[in-house]
Amino acid sequence: GNWQHDYVTRIFKKENLKGWRGTIHESPIYFGQEIKLKQSLIHLTHRNTQDNLRKSADWTIKEAVALEAAMVKKVTLRLILRKGIMEFYRRAFKYQGYKDGVPGLIEALVQAINRMIVYIQVWELQQKPSIATRYAKIEQEIKNLWRREGKINL
C-alpha cells in the first residue's frame, strides 16, 4: 500500500554528484536536469524475513533518534499501539495494500511492526536514567550482594 508513488532519483551522471542528503532514504544532490520515467521500476527489496529484520534493525534506530530529538511528549504504550494500528490501517486499507493479497497484507503488517519498533526505541531513548545505566546499577548491586555473601571473590 502506497508504494506506487515513491519517486526516487535513480540515474544521474556520476561526475555531477555533489553528495547525499538524508539518513534513512538517502537522495543524491547533483547538478543536472531531472526527468520522470513513464514506466515503473521493479523494486524487489523484500527477499526474506531475516533480511528484512536486519534492515529494520539498522534503520529503525536512525528514525527513532531523529524522532526523539523532535518529540516533546513522552511515548506511552497507548501511543506505540496506536501508531502500529494506524500504520497497518493506512497500508492495508487506505492505500489498498489488500489488493496485493496476502503479500500486501503481510507487508502492511511488517510496516506496522516497524512503526511500533521505532516508537519503542524512542521510549527507550526517553528513559532517564537510561536503561543501560539502570541495568549497570542493578548488576553492581548483585555483585556487591554476592561478595557480602561470599559467593564470588572479585
Name each model feature, range by range.
Residues 130-154:
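Alpha-helical transmembrane segments and their immediate juxtamembrane flanks
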Residues 1-129, 136, 151:
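Catalytic-site signature of metal-activated, phosphate-bearing donor transferases
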